[in-house]
Swiss-Prot record:
Catalytic activity: glucuronate acceptor + UDP-alpha-D-glucuronate = acceptor beta-D-glucuronoside + UDP + H(+); zolasartan + UDP-alpha-D-glucuronate = zolarsartan-1-N-beta-D-glucuronide + UDP
Membrane topology label: Single-pass membrane protein
EC primary class: transferase
A Gene Ontology molecular function term of the record: glucuronosyltransferase activity
Taxonomic placement: Eukaryota, Metazoa, Chordata, Craniata, Vertebrata
Natural source organism: Rattus norvegicus (Rat)
GO BP: cellular response to ethanol; cellular response to glucocorticoid stimulus; cellular response to hormone stimulus; liver development; vitamin D3 metabolic process
Gene name for this UniProt entry: Ugt1a5
Protein name: UDP-glucuronosyltransferase 1A5
Amino acid sequence: MGLHVTLQGLAGLLLLLYALPWAEGGKVLVFPMEGSHWLSMRDVVRELHARGHQAVVLAPEVTVHIKEEDFFTLQTYPVPYTRQGFRQQMMRNIKVVFETGNYVKTFLETSEILKNISTVLLRSCMNLLHNGSLLQHLNSSSFDMVLTDPVIPCGQVLAKYLGIPTVFFLRYIPCGIDSEATQCPKPSSYIPNLLTMLSDHMTFLQRVKNMLYPLALKYICHFSFTRYESLASELLQREVSLVEVLSHASVWLFRGDFVFDYPRPVMPNMVFIGGINCVIKKPLSQEFEAYVNASGEHGIVVFSLGSMVSEIPEKKAMEIAEALGRIPQTLLWRYTGTRPSNLAKNTILVKWLPQNDLLGHPKARAFITHSGSHGIYEGICNGVPMVMMPLFGDQMDNAKRMETRGAGVTLNVLEMTADDLENALKTVINNKSYKENIMRLSSLHKDRPIEPLDLAVFWVEYVMRHKGAPHLRPAAHDLTWYQYHSLDVIGFLLAIVLTVVFIVYKSCAYGCRKCFGGKGRVKKSHKSKTH
């Protein structure tokens, strides 16, 4: 028996040794986006490491969330700004969000914010792509692929330069660039554009708005992305458009699904991994477990305005604190600003909180969120109704979608009062329909053949195994705009129809002249002779 076991073990060892060359891990270059974008991408990098792959994360020296960890190698590059300057810029942006004003003022200030952010990101990209020694090092490192967030096109420009396939990890790209770069149909009749706060069932006037709204964003989009085209053209030594550069991605991993998003057409290389950020859960620390247990039968409310916003103006903070003190639940509020003087005993301020783990606790009663997609998905995954305070970007659209599904209440953070927040919290906690609706969405979201994290890792490995996925790239990328819409075919067929009509018309006219014109002339000449 012992010999039999030994032979089995030896056979297994030989099989393992034989398979090792084929099971060798790949090498991935990761170019992330700052903030919550990185926090969910980090889970993919961790899982790739667990499966034997090597990851190198390329990031600027000045970051907020991207730190060195044991499951990847951090490669930094210098940037022309300091950590303090970067933080001050972010604080100025947040301050503008909480300032009231008319539409024109708000639009101009928002444009200025986006302009400043775009300038910072572009300068960072320029420093990277003009760093000859670093580019040479990356080129000689034999990476199998690039994993990047295309909201900053720099990662894809780098991938094109290195000549290796790319997997995109994103929520969306502003201005509909993602639709253009994937050649995915996007009818404005039922697919709402970003920032319109419309649903997929629109009235006539809403469809007019949906069609015209992108024109208002042309200026911002032009400023934000056109300069990357110049940078890409310079590096690749040929004229390229941003859409052309992005169109060569092998696979697009969208952090969405059709429980949260409205149904729409998709292309073969578009994969949906919504909820990827709430797959990994950990037990609560003793500190937070104690807070939850002390809440009694009333439970807890989790309050966070996202990874980038932890301070708000003092007046608004006091309004919020007053409202929170009026409900019986224990409030766990992620807040690093000045402690409001009217903070009630039921409200606990923390610099950081395990949001997903707290929402997954049976005592979680409600979630106050800024409506970022990560927070929304954590609310859906854990079945917790929401009070939403959207601040900027797609957060207004996210809040609208959850509100129309009866899973939460939306408040205007600039105009709301303490009474508004109190009533909203009591509504989502005490009205059972909100809990029932969010639980239904949670059930739909979880009913899937594979977890989002496993799906994302599968496609990353797929691209590495096959050195890209060109067979998933539609031929639409190779067509001109008039070929794509078959305008040349329509023109050709129209010309044939018009030619046939013209020939038939001329033939009929000629026949009529022959049949009737001759008789008329004969009669006329005969009449003249008799006279």
